[in-house]
Amino acid sequence: MGINLQEVSYTYQAGTPFEGRALFNVSLEIKDGSFTAFIGHTGSGKSTIMQLLNGLNTPTEGTVLVDDVAIRSDSKNKDIKNIRKKVGLVFQFPESQLFDETVLKDVAFGPQNFGISKEEAEKLAREKLAMVGISEELFEKNPFELSGGQMRRVAIAGILAMEPSILVLDEPTAGLDPKGRRELMTLFKELHQGGMTIVLVTHLMDDVSNYADWVYVLEKGRIVLSGSPKSVFQEIEFLESKQLGVPKITQFAAHLRERGITFDALPITLEEFVEAIKNG
């Protein structure tokens, strides 16, 4: 199951004095089984696209196709609800959405909301909590008694319990320490390897180079560049003009190139850099 945006535009608060255009005639494809990243400066339209992918918002113009189900400005709630089960959306700081009295109940709420029995929902909740690294001794605790990193994992388990085939992540590691960030990104990598389509919004270019297989660059509601991370991160000057960076190792290699060391293409991961130096 993939997602296609066909000439999609989105206007906030249309028809009011506060009207603002967030997307302009955007067309793109998120392929089934891909790990697609979106990068762009604040206000570029990344989060707006994320909210369109699972029907949280509907396009002002154009069509969002999810597994051949169309979301348009006049789409009915029934169609959108089915899409929200297929496309799980993890907001930035998702722990702010926790609400129930125990960890287990919180994670089981989503599946029950889609008509799954309490028994089956709790079974799913246990499975997904284990998947994100939450031990059974925490299942009956109030989620607000957990650490920030644990709360983040519980919130993500709640999305996974609805068994989406596409997982949309809006800055999922924001505010976490390096260890917590690595652990979460490893989880998303494992989900992707298991067949799940992953969509990632991030400002961390090293995460794009290490995990994504396709990247879209947005500016002021338009796609200005797209391609494999390898090809996109060769465009250092262009990205800098958009107030965006490149992976640390790519920047380092670019400095070496200025000093006379040649590369067939700038490496975007440490492994590529080591290989290039060995073969240099």
UniProtKB/Swiss-Prot annotation:
It is a peripheral membrane protein. PROSITE patterns: ABC_TRANSPORTER_1 (PS00211), ABC_TRANSPORTER_2 (PS50893), CBIO (PS51246). One of its GO terms (cellular component) is ATP-binding cassette (ABC) transporter complex. It is an enzyme of class 7 (translocase). It is found in: Cell membrane. Residues 3-245 form the ABC transporter domain. InterPro entries: AAA+_ATPase, ABC_transporter-like_ATP-bd, ABC_transporter-like_CS, ABC_transpr_CbiO/EcfA_su, ECF_ABC_transporter_ATP-bd, EcfA2, P-loop_NTPase. The gene is ecfA2. Keywords: ATP-binding, Cell membrane, Membrane, Nucleotide-binding, Translocase, Transport. This is Energy-coupling factor transporter ATP-binding protein EcfA2. ATP binds at G40, H41, T42, G43, S44, G45, K46, S47. It comes from the Bacteria. GO terms for molecular function: ATP binding; ATP hydrolysis activity; ATPase-coupled transmembrane transporter activity. SUPFAM superfamilies: P-loop containing nucleoside triphosphate hydrolases (SSF52540). It comes from Streptococcus mutans serotype c (strain ATCC 700610 / UA159). Belongs to the ABC transporter superfamily. Energy-coupling factor EcfA family. ATP-binding (A) component of a common energy-coupling factor (ECF) ABC-transporter complex. Unlike classic ABC transporters this ECF transporter provides the energy necessary to transport a number of different substrates. Gene3D superfamilies: P-loop containing nucleotide triphosphate hydrolases (3.40.50.300). Its EC number is 7.-.-.-. Forms a stable energy-coupling factor (ECF) transporter complex composed of 2 membrane-embedded substrate-binding proteins (S component), 2 ATP-binding proteins (A component) and 2 transmembrane proteins (T component). Pfam families: ABC_tran.
